[in-house]
């Protein structure tokens, strides 16, 4: 191999390693068997969710995972691999891909990483069932408001009882 090709591959490894380090979550999939239309729909859905999706050679992914400190992740780089990176929303890639697997049998989740920790296929699928950030915040808000609401109802009931007795 020429030195130019080796330098280009080393640059790719560095770039992918940086993406892996910066990513809030990474999902590795086997997209073999997807039709062009399905692939286009998947990529559009991921892009709309702020997720970057790339098909990358396993040799480059393996070296990048080693550089990023995700050595255990290289076990999933067998067969054709595509990787979804999300820098902001931890749940987005898992949710979009898991939802898409329900309509496209050819897409298979292989594994991934969540906030720098290697995760199994099952953990990625469990992550996909969680609500997104907005959903979690609204759930937290309703839990925090419940005690205040109960106190307000109790005060109102006491006030009504005193008015009725007077």
Curated annotation (Swiss-Prot):
Q: Which organism is it from?
A: Streptococcus pyogenes serotype M18 (strain MGAS8232)
Pfam families (alphabetical): Ribosomal_L10 (PF00466)
User: Per its UniProt record, what PANTHER family does this chain match?
Assistant: 39S RIBOSOMAL PROTEIN L10, MITOCHONDRIAL
Phylogenetic placement of the source organism: Bacteria, Bacillati, Bacillota, Bacilli, Lactobacillales
The record's section on InterPro entries has: Ribosomal_uL10 (IPR001790), Ribosomal_uL10-like_sf (IPR043141), Ribosomal_uL10_bac (IPR022973), Ribosomal_uL10_bac_type (IPR047865), Ribosomal_uL10_CS_bac (IPR002363)
Is this entry keyworded Translocase?
no
This molecule's function is given as: Forms part of the ribosomal stalk, playing a central role in the interaction of the ribosome with GTP-bound translation factors.
Does the record's keyword annotation contain Zinc?
no
Q: Which keywords describe this protein according to UniProt? A: Ribonucleoprotein, Ribosomal protein, RNA-binding, rRNA-binding
Q: Which family does it belong to?
A: Belongs to the universal ribosomal protein uL10 family.
What's in the GO CC field? large ribosomal subunit
- The protein's name is Large ribosomal subunit protein uL10
HAMAP family from the entry?
A: Ribosomal_uL10 (MF_00362)
Classification via NCBIfam families: PRK00099.1-1
UniProt subunit comment = Part of the ribosomal stalk of the 50S ribosomal subunit. The N-terminus interacts with L11 and the large rRNA to form the base of the stalk. The C-terminus forms an elongated spine to which L12 dimers bind in a sequential fashion forming a multimeric L10(L12)X complex.
Q: Where is the signal peptide?
A: none
